[in-house]
Structure formats: C-alpha cells, structure tokens
Amino acid sequence: MSHQQRHDRYTAALALLGSPEAIIRLGGALALVELADDWLTDETDPQEHGRRKAQTIITTLCAYICSPFQLAHDYERLMGDQPQGLTPQQARRFRAEKTELAAEAQVRGRILTEIHDRVHWEPSDGGQPATNTAPDPEKVTAGLWSHLRFDFSGAVFFYPVDFTQSYWGAGANLRGCTYRDQARFTRSIYGADALFDRSVYHGEAFLSDSVYRAGAGLSECVWGADARLVGCVYEGNVNLSACTWEGAAYLSDCTYYGYTYLADSVYRGDADFWQSTFYGTANLEHCTYYRGARFEDSIYHSAAYLGDSVFRRTANLAFTVYWGAAHFGGCVFAGQAWLDNSVWFGGADFSGVKFKKKTDFEEARLLGAADFSGASFARVPAFTDGVFNAAAENLFEVSAKSKQPLPLAGGIPQGARALTATERQVLTERLQAAGAGRETNAREFEQPRSELIRWVRYEVAGTPDEAEADSAG
C-alpha cells in the first residue's frame, strides 16, 4: 500500500473519530489502530519512518482519551439509579445521558484495550508469566507498540483501566489523571520515567509487582480506596510523597535502589511497608498514620529519615536493620511501639520522641550512637537482652515531662548490656568489610552484610552476666 493511500486512510479515520455517533467514533479509532499496525509491520518501509507515523497515530488516540467529556463530571449521578420524583422530561433526559455516558465509556475503554493488547509483554521462553513476583525485563518480549510514547496526562477515566502486564519502553505519562473505577497496572515494566503524580484514584488501585527502570513519580496522589503497590522494584529515584491514602496502603516487599521520597503523606487506613529494602536514602518524614503501621523486617542500607511523624495506633518496626543513620526525632508513638530485634549500625536518633504506650526495644542492637535526649515515656521502656555500644556518644537524658524514667545500669538502659571490647573490635572489622560508613554501592556488599547481620543477631547476644563472663575470659 502506498504512502498516499495510508494518508487517505488516516484522514478518513480522523473524520470518523469526530462523528457525533459513538459507534462511528469507535470505527474511526479501530481504523487508526489497524493503520498503526500496518506502519510498524511494513518491511518494505524504513523502520524509523513507520515508527514516526505510528507515533502520530498513538498521539492522536491518547489525545482522544484525554479530551474532556462533559457527562463524565456527572459520573456518580449517572451511574446510580434514576432518582425519584423526576418529571417525564427529566426522566427521559436522565436515561439519555446515562446511555450516552455508557456509549462513550465503551469507545474509550475499547481504545485502551487495543493499546493494552499491543504493549502487553510475554515471557521470552514462551511459558506462562509468573504471578505474585516482579518480571525480569531481560526475559520478556515486549509488545508491538511498547517502544512508542504514551501521554494520558489529565485524562478522566470513567471506566475501568486495565494495563496489567504491560511494557512501556518509552515510559508513560499519566500525570493528573482521575480514575473513577478500578485501575490495574500490575506486573508492568517501565523502561523510562513513569509519571503518575497528582492523580486521584476513586476505586481500588493495583500496581503491584512492577519494575521501574528509571524514575517513578507518584507524588501528590489521592488513593481513595485500597491501593496495592506490593513487590515493586524501583531502579531509579522514586517520589511517593505528599499522598493521601484513604484506604489501606499495601507497599510491602518492595526494593528501592535510588533515592526514595515518601515524606509528607497521610495514611488513614493501614500502612504496610513490611519487608522493604532501601539501598539509597529513604525519606519518610512528616507522615501521619491513623491506623496500624508495619515496617518490620526491612533493611535500610543508607540513611533513613522517619522523624516528625505521628503513629496514632500500633507501629511495628521490629526485626529491621539500619546501616546508616536512622532519624526518628520528633515522632509521636500514640500506640504501642515495637522496635524489638532491630539492628542500628549507624546512629539511632530518638531525640524528642514521645512514646505514649508500651515501648519495646527487647533484643535490639544499637551499635552506633543512641540518642534518647528529650524523649518521653508513658511506660518504662523494655530493653531486655538489648545491646549497646558504650564507647559511642550515647545520650539518655529524657525530657523532664516524661512520666517514666529511662532506667540505666552501667550507663546504658537497664536490661541491656554493652558490647565487649572483643565484640567492638570484631564489629569494626566487619563493618569495614561490609562497606559501612562510606559512600558505596551496598549491592556489592550483600554477602558480608548478611553475614554481619547474622553475627550481630545470633552471636552478639546474651544477658549482662554472660557478657561479663565473656569479657573476663
């Protein structure tokens, strides 16, 4: 087919896309989809030329999806039952508007389906894709349109969005979107920046098991229902700050390789960050958690900033490892605070923290400088079988307004013990081998870091009496 014939097809399809009839608009959209496929699969035409022509079509389809549709503003009214007490004329108008909204939703939903079919990835080996795990981008075959650019910014999706298992090789722009129904992006791969900032999700959001190979922008979003971002891999920087989570926020089992910005957010439902791994600096300051907050069994390879946050109910930060400085200064734990069995290799800053209920540091390892200056406790904190580094610059002078003291024995919290001289020497050597305390790629030190964690947890243990015996021996 000649270029002129394809140009004529493009012009005709655009005319159909502007029809007042929904079924004709759909025909125009499908004609454009077919034409884009023709450009990309024509082996007689230079590849770059076909790609440019296909990109023009994609841009047109995205512009249609983003174009305003007046009745979408009345989504809730038109999706409900016909109101009582309408006049016959009002009832006819309601039914007509409801039908028109449904027809346009079908057109736009079908366009998204056609796009999804062409950015959908499949395993390179021809097998079935694994579920409940992020895909390996090197072991998938991208879709025909995966290398093209998609800009849906500002779109109002008044119909379900399903981009499950998609490969966005040039990234995707979904900034400022509104999702009136469910949004599904599970097991997606983003080869360039993925932009979801300033979006509103009225329905459930599914973004789990996805891989972000460049930057990920999800800041200033409102998640109106449960949101699932479990098991994601962020290879670049990620911005999830200034979000409002109205439902449960599931962000467990994620891996963050770059700078992670999760500050200034409000969690009105449960917040779950269980088993997260942060390689770069993690900033989670100035957050408010209205329900349970789970951070246990996580690893921070660089500095962790969680200060000036409010935990209104139980906060579980147990079994967590901090390789860099950990900042909790100014936090308020209104519910129980579980920090037991955690390890701080760098400084642990709890200055000015208010612990208003039970506080558990049992079997914790605070091996850098521990700062509890100005902290306040409603109950005596538990440090049973904990371990401190007495050679560090520890500060234990609590606030004068604290209802309970921080009982000390031998200069450290009662129930805990100090590292022996031998343990301090071994710790220093192993920290150096693990690349701690300097700018480094923590991924290169996985084995020595894992070995050091095991040593600290299972060999640097025991009661104060046992430590004294070890020192004497």
Region roles according to the model:
Residues 8-15, 20-33, 38-473:
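N-terminal leader/targeting and pre-domain segments
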Residues 1-5:
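Transmembrane signal-anchor/signal-peptide helices with a preference for the extracytoplasmic
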